[in-house]
Amino acid sequence: METLFNGTLALAGRDQETTGFAWWAGNARLINLSGKLLGAHVAHAGLIVFWAGAMNLFEVAHFVPEKPMYEQGLILLPHLATLGWGVGPGGEVIDTFPYFVSGVLHLISSAVLGFGGIYHALLGPETLEESFPFFGYVWKDRNKMTTILGIHLILLGLGAFLLVFKALYFGGVYDTWAPGGGDVRKITNLTLSPSIIFGYLLKSPFGGEGWIVSVDDLEDIIGGHVWLGSICILGGIWHILTKPFAWARRALVWSGEAYLSYSLGALSVFGFIACCFVWFNNTAYPSEFYGPTGPEASQAQAFTFLVRDQRLGANVGSAQGPTGLGKYLMRSPTGEVIFGGETMRFWDLRAPWLEPLRGPNGLDLSRLKKDIQPWQERRSAEYMTHAPLGSLNSVGGVATEINAVNYVSPRSWLATSHFVLGFFFFVGHLWHAGRARAAAAGFEKGIDRDFEPVLSMTPLN
């Protein structure tokens, strides 16, 4: 029996002798074969899009309209619902057909990508430089590399504008802050003021500041996409039309592995930011679909017990808790009236069900006594019992279930997965950056392939 280990089946130009990389080094064998590397990337895109389509249809098939999305372990339908597809007032799903269409479109796209990937991996030209010079490249050709960078930036900018167009012209997006409990609406009055948009970038990442993660209205989010899309498109045109300056030519390493390390570093940053965004932000990730944030569940519990004990006759304005601080209400470091108890650390929380009860100095005691609506009680009781805690040690006072409840919030899944992937990508960034710098300095040739242990082992056959 022949295997890829003994080389006879390895395709020309992709074996260990030609490339210096064994089969398990993956795309490293294709560093200088632009046509085959194209095939690998297109096939990979096909796998990604196939997963998206198949998982999308799987979630549609299992979806129960009577239960909230976050109780059903869904991670794709909440994204479609946030874009305004298939939902109505209060985030209620009124039509699952758009979700079905999304899944089918992704499956069809994946078939096209899969065909293209297989074609370029097996049948297409090994290198593109001769037949298709526009698509060909040499890794150390700085001008070509920045042109490719520019094309990528333009595509990213167009992607940002897709969200803008959806929000402005194609039915709008879901706004958790819409009056009456959230609804799909067109975003008409965009925030384009640079002081507001770029002010987010200058905020502290801590506490009540929260950097860009603190954004809490859709006008700012869509306006930010206008700015970002414009910057990406203009930057892309700039990189296509210009050559790298001398300082950039000197400062950067210009090799395939260096570009890989830059990309992994960028994706790592994206992963960490996405982790914080999905964990803390209930505007871009509405609680109706993703479940409450951790702070939101904690504040919801404090609110629920305030409502209960107030009905039982407690004076919530003056009752003292076991620490001598207010049991239900207390003051924040800056003087606002906030919920007391362990949830005090989450006094920054803003949520659509709570804001109507605030006055100019924090929570308004007269509103808490007279204006609490049944929908606010229902919402907070629901959120209190669906905290995204998993097995965190510090739960902000939320009563935790140990045996009975089988519930993991999509926020937990999405935040954890993006943190872990962000960390792994960061390690990959360090690894490939180190190798690329060493290779550029001329003292790193990789592992000595002549004395690898595997070469002295008995062949598998």
From Swiss-Prot:
GO terms for molecular function: chlorophyll binding; electron transporter, transferring electrons within the cyclic electron transport pathway of photosynthesis activity; metal ion binding. The modification N-acetylthreonine is found at residue 3. It is a multi-pass membrane protein. Binds multiple chlorophylls and provides some of the ligands for the Ca-4Mn-5O cluster of the oxygen-evolving complex. It may also provide a ligand for a Cl- that is required for oxygen evolution. PSII binds additional chlorophylls, carotenoids and specific lipids. Pfam families: PSII. Keywords: Acetylation, Chlorophyll, Chloroplast, Chromophore, Manganese, Membrane, Metal-binding, Phosphoprotein, Photosynthesis, Photosystem II, Plastid, Thylakoid, Transmembrane, Transmembrane helix. Residues 1-2 form a propeptide. GO terms for cellular component: chloroplast thylakoid membrane; photosystem II. The modification Phosphothreonine is found at residue 3. One of the components of the core complex of photosystem II (PSII). It binds chlorophyll and helps catalyze the primary light-induced photochemical processes of PSII. PSII is a light-driven water:plastoquinone oxidoreductase, using light energy to abstract electrons from H(2)O, generating O(2) and a proton gradient subsequently used for ATP formation. HAMAP family: PSII_PsbC_CP43. This is Photosystem II CP43 reaction center protein. It comes from Nicotiana sylvestris (Wood tobacco).
